[in-house]
Regions:
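Bacterial N-terminal signal peptides that target proteins for export
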Residues: 1-12, 23, 510, 527-531
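Extracellular/surface-exposed low-complexity segments
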Residues: 4-5, 16-68, 271, 409, ...
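Extracellular repeat-rich scaffold modules on cell surfaces
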Residues: 29-61, 120, 144-237, 269-363, ...
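Extracellular beta-strand/loop-rich repeat segments of large surface/secreted proteins
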Residues: 45, 275, 363-459
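Glycine-rich repeat segments that build the extracellular carbohydrate-interaction surface of secreted
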Residues: 58-78, 99, 348, 386, ...
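N-terminal extracellular ligand-recognition/capping segment immediately after the signal peptide
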Residues: 70-94, 237-245, 251-260, 355, ...
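A short, hydrophobic C-terminal helix/tail in secreted or cell-surface proteins
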Residues: 508-527
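C-terminal membrane-anchoring or membrane-association module
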Residues: 523-545
Length: 545
């Protein structure tokens, strides 16, 4: 038998249900529903038929406790929307299975619990289209007892949760709801929304769900045990909309999102909890999946690293926060027209940001990478800019006509003389504003008469670094005069010039002339040769006279 989850699929873990029972049983009368076979006629299944009750009277009133027994099966099935319960306050059952609908006619609170003797049985919700007073409501699983985890498990082959309308899963704080059956559409294209501060854990067959309307995270935590593939994964074949809450792995193993993503609020990816800190990857499925920034959104990377392979679009702004790293890979083209703010953590840009929107890197945040940003980019005071990949790999970062404004710390690494592969470089087609500090980290010394193009191509330059410091194979700082920074390190002189963006190393003592190009270095030895030649020519003329 296929168990079907019809209806609004609104399962809420928060306010009432499992575990509540009247404390003064003796003050209530008990009526037992017999219900015949429960399979042959609506008369035998009706709660409003007096003959179906052992008292031959339909129980009503607040002093009545309706106890339900099944004479032919250990599972009672309430089958029809026409069934109703009076104003009783408790249904006591061993194991109960709701197929399509449970309807109650009063505004009372109903507690559905397992009250069997000895080892407790199983409480099963197979279909939950709950109607109270003619209005669709939610069945709520209460955390008022010792219950902390609620598990909906797949016990028979072919059991699925089938959606006949869209709805909400509400999991209260301190509670975890685990779903293992596959979730699929029963008719139409249905959506599932997660609210509440508790944990929804998707495991088993639920990680291969196929419902097409999409999954919306609007509160609490959602974690998943297996990532699936595009079209068959924990979030179905529709978009994953992130409005509020946290997405994390069920373990320390990384997990992937294989759905189109809609950013529409504030969401956290990953976790600082060592039990759930697996990295999150947002996959593109060979470019078929993309991210829409529907409104001004905040993505917090709680820890670790999130690789974002999807391209972006939309009019919203994107703010990155948290201690972790977001890496927009070479698979991603960022075309959203709202601004991008790195409020905390690290933005590792390997992709191409084609929109003209501004990028800002705040205090204690970092921008690194070898990608391209077209819009105006500002490294604010306290922020860090480091071209190249994290961990010492060098590279070239490219900025478009929007230019680059530096007011924080710029860190560039030098391990040789080949631009991009051995030392960091910055290409800029727009204006360059110097500011903040520049730290040059050397791995090895440079040969005499070497010139490095640190900053290249800018349309104009302005401002000054507050300091230029060298570390590693060279140690010390450079002093500035009229836009030229100079430092002496052993037998070499190192010079950085604002107007060219070049770093030049020559022997000491030396006179350095940069005649508009790299490598146009005139040393003292050259001057001496020319001076000697001039003296020789003068002596020759004197002899001839």
């Amino acid at each position: 038998m296929r168990s079907i989850l019809r209806a609004t699929f609104a399962i809420a873990v928060a306010m009432l249900a499992i575990g509540f029972q009247p404390t003064t049983v003796s003050a209530q009368s008990v009526s037992t529903f017999l219900g015949g076979s429960g399979t042959t006629s609506t008369t035998q299944q009706s709660w409003t038929t007096a003959g179906n009750w052992n008292t031959a009277t339909v129980p009503t009133g607040t002093a009545v406790w309706a106890q339900i027994n099944s004479s032919t099966s250990p599972i009672l099935r309430i089958l029809y929307t026409s069934t109703s319960v009076g104003s009783g306050t408790s249904l006591t059952v061993g194991a109960i299975s709701f197929l399509p609908t449970l309807a109650v006619s009063s505004g009372s609170t109903y507690a559905i619990q397992n009250n069997s003797a000895g080892t407790k049985g199983t409480l099963k919700f197979y279909g939950i289209d709950t109607t109270i007073d003619g209005t669709a409501r939610r069945i709520i699983l209460d955390n008022q007892t010792s219950l902390s985890d609620v598990n909906f498990t797949q016990t028979l082959a072919g059991q699925d949760f089938e959606l006949y309308s869209s709805g909400v899963i509400n999991v209260a704080a301190g509670t975890q709801l685990t779903l293992t059956p596959l979730i699929r559409d029963g008719s139409g294209s249905r959506t599932v929304t997660k609210i509440g501060r508790g944990v929804l854990s998707l495991a088993g067959s639920s990680t291969s769900s196929t419902y097409a309307g999409g999954f919306s995270l609007e509160g609490g935590i959602v974690q998943w045990a297996s990532s699936g593939v595009s079209g068959t994964n924990p979030f179905g074949s529709g978009p994953l909309t992130l409005r509020s809450g946290t997405l994390r792995s069920t373990t320390t193993t990384g997990k992937s999102i294989n759905s189109n993503v809609v950013l529409d609020g504030s969401v956290t990816l990953g976790s600082t909890d060592p039990s759930f800190n697996g990295n999150i990857t947002v996959n593109s499925s060979s470019g078929s999946l993309a991210t829409t920034i529907a409104s001004n959104s905040i993505v917090t990377i709680a820890g670790g690293s999130t690789a974002w392979n999807q391209s972006t679009s939309g009019t919203g702004s994107l703010t990155l926060a948290g201690s972790g790293q977001v890496r927009f890979t070479s698979l991603s083209t960022l075309a959203h027209t709202g601004s991008t703010v790195v409020q905390a953590g690290t933005l590792n840009m390997q992709g191409n940001m084609t929109s003209a929107s501004a990028v800002s890197v705040f205090n204690a945040a970092t921008l690194l990478g070898t990608g391209t940003i077209s819009g105006a980019t500002s490294i604010l005071s306290g922020g860090t800019f480091s071209p190249g990949a994290q961990g010492g790999a060098t590279g070239v970062f490219t900025f478009g006509s929007g230019g680059l404004s530096l007011a924080g710390q710029s860190l560039m690494e030098v391990a040789g003389v080949t631009r991009g592969t051995q030392y960091d470089g910055v290409d800029i087609s727009g204006p360059l504003g110097y500011g903040g500090s520049l730290l040059l980290q050397f791995s090895g010394t440079l040969a005499d008469n070497t010139a490095l193009e640190l900053f290249k191509g800018f349309s104009s330059q302005s401002g000054l670094f507050s300091s230029i410091t060298v570390a590693g194979s060279y140690t010390g700082s450079l002093a500035e005069s009229s836009g030229v920074w100079t430092g002496v390190f052993g037998a070499q002189t190192m010079t950085f010039t604002n107007s060219t963006g070049n770093l030049v190393v020559v022997p000491e003592p030396a006179v350095v002339g940069l005649l508009g190009g790299v490598g146009m270095v005139v040393t003292v030895a050259g001057l001496r040769r020319r001076r000697a030649s001039m003296q020789l020519a003068s002596r020759k003329r004197a002899v001839e006279v």
